[in-house]
Amino acid sequence: MELEYESKRPLYIPYAGPILLEFPLLNKGSAFTNDERSHFNLHGLLPEAVETIEEQAERAYRQYQDFKNDDDKHIYLRNIQDTNETLFYRLLEAHLSEMMPIIYTPTVGEACEHFSDIYRRARGLFISYPNREHIDDMLQNATKQNVKVIVVTDGERILGLGDQGIGGMGIPIGKLSLYTACGGISPAYTLPVVLDVGTNNPQRLNDPLYMGWRHPRISGDEYYAFVDEFIQAVKRRWPNVLLQFEDFAQNNATPLLNRYRDELCCFNDDIQGTAAVTLGSLIAASHAAGSQLRDQTVTFLGAGSAGCGIAEQIIAQMISEGLSEEQARARVFMVDRFGLLTDKLPNLLDFQSKLVQKSDALQSWNLTSDSISLQDVVRNAKPTVLIGVSGQPGLFTEELIREMHKHCARPIVMPLSNPTSRVEARPEDIINWTDGAALVATGSPFSPVSYKEKLYPIAQCNNSYIFPGIGLGVLASGAKRVTDGMLMAASRALAQCSPLAQNGEGALLPNIDDIQAVSKTIAMQVGKAAQLQGVAIVTSEEALAKAIEHNYWQPQYRTYKRTSF
């Protein structure tokens, strides 16, 4: 049954009695009116009082506050989501900045690690390799028929926690919660999926409660054939769906994106979403520092698919600001565990090969060894931007940051690794080491830093600023693909929303409580870019704006009327 939430007309429901209360998308709990209780055989199944959604949310928030640790709060919120989705999103809307770290990073990492321990109720689809011949049937079994957004993972690279097997399902569930809470995508249109291809994590394989396929991960041709079976089944079932790849290992993430990005409307949030939000933050930071991105010299710690995806977006923006491709690439330095990527380094991955520095250009560098370390790069290249996507804590040392600050009045430092325990440096330390001069953005949430009687807000360079707006823009415009131009438009729109860039003070990124307005701004620019690039039907700007509002779902109860199947 298709649930058209956008309309304010009554919703005709064929279910009644206890069955109706079991549908999270339909259940109102104590908010069913007396007429509805009569028509749907609910008298006696609910307490006497008829409540508003505001009263329900107040009770839920009081209960939420009674939990003392974040893991228990996460479990509580997920229980509400699995019972009454409208109430869940009304609660999130009222307390978004407080609850976002609970439903997503960093708390979702713990939920993924303990998925089989805290499992209560099925949500989404579990597509397992042993049942690969029945994928079409599994998609037909989905409780939601008109799916418009899918987030899919294979659980191999969950945040900075590695292989969690089907425990990775916590990520698609959390991401889609933010598509709704931040981007207004109706929960009736979203579907989380985990591809269960086994796990190489001995803790999971040896856990008697692990609920996934107890088998080492399949790989190579066998793996890619299975993913292709899933993609083709999705295309048959929902040909116009937006599919987001999430937390695939870097050796699979880029090949899958390259293979399917021209075949269906899809993107990889770890590569493209992370790149888009980081680029938007850098554009804003550059403006706040009185310069353009083309003027920056950028050093990365971490040269995986996420880091290289960010680097390519930065290079594209530098080129759009007037640099040649050669000039732009010469300003970006990639460092991994083997040192700086150069044209003499063997065994580079395909996506790394275009991001090497030419050895001839490094002849004048003062080096301490044959392997060019991060310290060597900072001392010789004199970067103005330092980005961490290594997943290794504490690698942005005091010595390193102070060396950077010697040649850069306002260094831009972005330790983006998740969760908090994996961050390359803590914002408080960066602010102290630079005497308050650094512009800091992190991947996980941090409290403002107090330094010399001044409060420094710390921007969370969170993909949640980007992907909900992309999703809303795709749905509103009817885009058939997600192009690089649409992602670039999202980055520039985010930069325009920066309080620091606009006013010269405040946070680098907007307040999380303003993220719904930010998502609509991004959706508008994404939709316009889709039209310009020929992947969406051209309409007027006014029509696109109306489509965005029409597609923006609000957590409000509708009136129900009874009908038969």
Swiss-Prot record:
Homotetramer. One of its GO terms (biological process) is malate metabolic process. It comes from Yersinia enterocolitica serotype O:8 / biotype 1B (strain NCTC 13174 / 8081). This is NAD-dependent malic enzyme. The active site is at Y104, K175. A divalent metal cation binds at E246, D247, D270. It catalyses: (S)-malate + NAD(+) = pyruvate + CO2 + NADH; oxaloacetate + H(+) = pyruvate + CO2. Its cofactor is Mg(2+); Mn(2+). GO terms for molecular function: malate dehydrogenase (decarboxylating) (NAD+) activity; metal ion binding; NAD binding; oxaloacetate decarboxylase activity. Its EC number is 1.1.1.38. NAD(+) binds at R157, D270, N418. The lineage of its organism: Bacteria, Pseudomonadati, Pseudomonadota, Gammaproteobacteria, Enterobacterales. InterPro entries: Aminoacid_DH-like_N_sf (IPR046346), Malic_enzyme_CS (IPR015884), Malic_N_dom (IPR012301), Malic_N_dom_sf (IPR037062), Malic_NAD-bd (IPR012302), Malic_OxRdtase (IPR001891), NAD(P)-bd_dom_sf (IPR036291), NAD_malic_enz_proteobac (IPR023667). Keywords: Metal-binding, NAD, Oxidoreductase. Belongs to the malic enzymes family. Divalent metal cations. Prefers magnesium or manganese. One of its GO terms (cellular component) is cytosol. The gene is maeA. The record marks D270 as: Important for activity. It is an enzyme of class 1 (oxidoreductase). Pfam families: malic, Malic_M.
